[in-house]
Amino acid sequence: MIPKIYENLRHIVTQLLSIFKVAESETPAIGRPKKITDADALTFALYQHASTRATKKSVYEDFKENLACSYKTFVVSVNRVSMLTLRLLAIIMRFNKQTSHLVKYTDATDIPVCLKKNMDEHKTMRSMAGLGRSTKGWFYGLKMTLTRDHDGRMLALKFTKPGENDRDIFREINKDIYGIIVADAGYVSKQLEQDMYLEHKRWILIRPFKTMKRLMTKWQEQLYKGRFKIEFDFRDLKLFHGLVTSLPRSVNGYLANYLHALLSFIVA
């Protein structure tokens, strides 16, 4: 029996591919045809992140009777469509920028790839991960910087090592975003505010440190209070869409997990 959530996700995937005119990769002229189509593989990936399934193995067990392939082929197929997922995310964010709310929020969160005590033995993401520190303490992994608008539309995204300069990342991902962009005290910089300011188009509102004696108007306070929404997005991504994992055994597996979790968060 096919779960209802899978059928709903299959319909969503079909609609996305049709609306945005994203073509699946063609079947090779020579060699064996695909055991799992790109649309089905993407649906399986979203099913994992939108349901309670923590691993690809559990998803495979759910559909083993309907799949004419091995578990290895299933994993390869799901990881293969990460490029299709990346294209969909890019198209969705580009579309969201055209219809976005005036107020935007930018923030970063930690994405551990393993426990800190295991960092010396971790090899899979060694070229991309690094040691960083967040409000929760030290971690070994990546940093994800995200911009969303007041209504929850995802507008920009970037993965970096934890040691990358937050202000440089802010400039890069928000260079084509306009309106009022609100950020926390980690982005405090007079130069950043001057660089990003565009008269009648873009204004940066950065919350000052508690030790900084700066007056704040009532409407600025209300904008600052809205930052909890992007914090909730990070929480939902990690708790309910499986953004953080240490299970993949390849770089492609890690990146596919992050991209599929983000698309699941947007559409599921």
Describe the residue ranges of each PLM region.
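Short alpha-helical elements
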Residues: M1-A268
